[in-house]
Structures are given as C-alpha cells and as structure tokens.
Design a protein with these regions (language model features):
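Active-site-proximal helix-loop-helix substrate-binding element of RNase H-like nuclease domains
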Residues: 35, 72-212, 222-226, 230
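Conserved "right-hand" nucleotidyltransferase catalytic core of DNA-directed polymerases
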Residues: 1-92, 181-188, 192-304
Length: 304
C-alpha cells in the first residue's frame, strides 16, 4: 500500500526516501484521486496581463529555485482567481513590466492569500513594486499549529487532512547542481498550479484549526502584521554604527574571557567550556552535580 508506505516514511522522517517515492508517483492513480477531491481549475499562461486577469480576491505565489529570495531568480509567478476557478501563470518580465499587475499587487482593496507573505513582499519590493492586501499567510498559520511541519506544502496538507496533489520541489526540479525548471513546461505549470490550488484548499481548514487552538486572534492581530514589519526591515535594512559595534564586540570578548577564567577557577582546572563532553565531566564527576540525563556520548548539558 503506497499511501501507508508514504505515511511510514513521514513518521520516521525518511525524507529522502519519501521524496524519491513521490517522484515515482507523479502520474499515479493515487495522485489523480487526490486531485479529483479538489476543485478543478483552468490553467492559463499569460503573455500579457489585462484587468480581467486580476481578481478582487486571489491566491498568489512566486516561484524561485533558490532559498535566498533577496537574490534568487524568479522562474514563474502564479495566482488564482478563486471565484472563476482559474490559475494564471506568467513570467517575471510580463508581470513586473505590467503597470496593471503592479497596481493590483499594491492595492489594499484586492485580497491576496500567500504561502509566505514576508517573502512575497520582499520579492515585489526588489522589483520596484509594493505588495499589499495580504489576507492570509499559510506558513505562519502552519507554524502556529505545528512548528515541525511548516516547510513545504507537501508536509502542510497532512496537518489538516487536505488531499495532497503537490510533489516535493526536489521531485520536480531535482537538487544540487542539477536543480532546474523541467524542460517540459506543462510539468512546471502543473506544479505551480497544484501549489496554488492546494493553498486555496488549505486556507479555511487552517483557520478552523487556529480557532480550535484559540490562536486565530494571535495569528490575525500579531503574527500577520509582524510579518509585514519584518519584511520592511529586510527591504530597508537597519542602520548601524560600525564603531559602536566594534567597541561592544571588544567588551563582549573581554567579558567572555573573564567568565571563562571564573569558570576555570570554580572548576579548579582549565578545560574547553564549549565542549559538552568536558563540561559534563566537570559538572557531574568533579563537582558531583545531580545527573538529569545521560546520552550515549556522555552527560547531557542541555538547558532542559
């Protein structure tokens, strides 16, 4: 049973094996069954943008192959008209050369659901546009619910039991030096569309889960506005005084040296305070402090 095997891989965190299995399942009936449970969206690739392509409420995602969204290359931009059940896909050039698109992106009257609002706001700013009207951030919602699975959409869908139609990026783009957009553009476009459709499907279940956990207000009133502030900090940067930092650095180095000397005096010998193994011997063998936890490699010196 492939579904049971995938769940086993997830539980055991066999991520490499899971991604390999997903790569083999690109065209399987299991994938098709999941897709059948979600609304069917028409996919349209745009060479030009007109007003009818820009809905009042949308789900938007910008694709990059690099993790660093400040310097990465945009390989595609996709958004959904939820009401009309259409996914539009276009290039960076078409989107950011369109005044209509940039005006829509900056409009607070046009709601946008995102995967990562901070990332989208920074990407837009680096291309001379504002990103406003953010109504939902999928990653922030997921992080509040389950911090360990706030990564790819493939992981997020399991939290609220949404049908999974999205493959891991690695299964589509490859990894390392061979990471690239597929030569078959239909595969690439479908991957982007699947991300968008999944984000549409995730919004309400994630909101319901946040409400159950009494974190919806935290999400809406604190976390979402904070993401915008953090994005603006990344965009504008933070002015620092180099001389002041250097003075403080010297003070910190001296303070750390004094603390290390004091530790050695209390221990009665010199040792590497940054070595958990050496620190464990001093604390639990020489000073006879109570042992809270012991691992295969020695005493645990963790805070807990």
């Amino acid at each position: 049973n492939v579904d049971e095997l995938m769940e086993f891989y997830r539980q055991m965190e066999f991520n490499v094996a899971l991604k390999a299995l997903q790569a083999e399942m690109t065209d399987t009936s299991s994938h098709e069954e999941a897709a059948a449970q979600l609304p069917q969206y028409e996919i349209e690739c745009l060479e030009a943008i007109v007003a009818e392509h820009l809905p009042t409420r949308a789900v938007l995602y910008t694709e990059m192959l690099e993790d660093n969204y400040h310097f990465g290359e945009v390989v595609g931009i996709a958004w959904a008209d939820i009401k009309e059940q259409k996914v539009y896909i276009t290039s960076e050039e078409v989107a950011y050369n369109s005044e209509l698109f940039k005006d829509w992106l900056s409009s607070k009257d046009h709601e946008k659901v995102t995967l990562d609002s901070k990332r989208e706001r920074v990407i837009a700013a680096n291309r001379g546009a504002e990103f406003n009207g953010i109504s939902f951030d999928t990653l922030i919602a997921t992080y509040l619910i389950d911090v360990h699975n706030a990564q790819e959409l493939t992981d997020i869908v399991r939290i609220v039991d949404v049908p999974s139609i999205v493959l891991y990026d690695e299964a589509v783009y490859g990894k390392g030096a061979k990471k690239a957009v597929p030569e078959d553009k239909a595969v690439f476009n479908q991957h982007l569309a699947n991300k968008i459709i999944t984000m549409v499907a995730l919004e309400e279940p994630l909101k319901e889960k946040l409400s159950e956990l009494h974190m919806l207000e935290l999400f809406q009133e604190i976390e979402m506005p904070l993401a915008i502030i953090l994005a603006d900090m990344e965009i504008r940067g933070i002015a620092v005084n180099r001389e002041v930092l250097e003075v403080r650095n010297e003070k910190m180095i001296k303070l750390l040296a004094q603390m290390e000397t004091s530790i050695h005096e209390h221990a009665g010998e010199e040792f590497n305070v940054n070595s958990p193994k050496q620190l464990g011997v001093i604390l639990f063998e020489k000073l006879n402090l109570p042992v809270i936890k012991k691992t295969k490699t020695g005493y645990s010196t963790a805070a807990d």
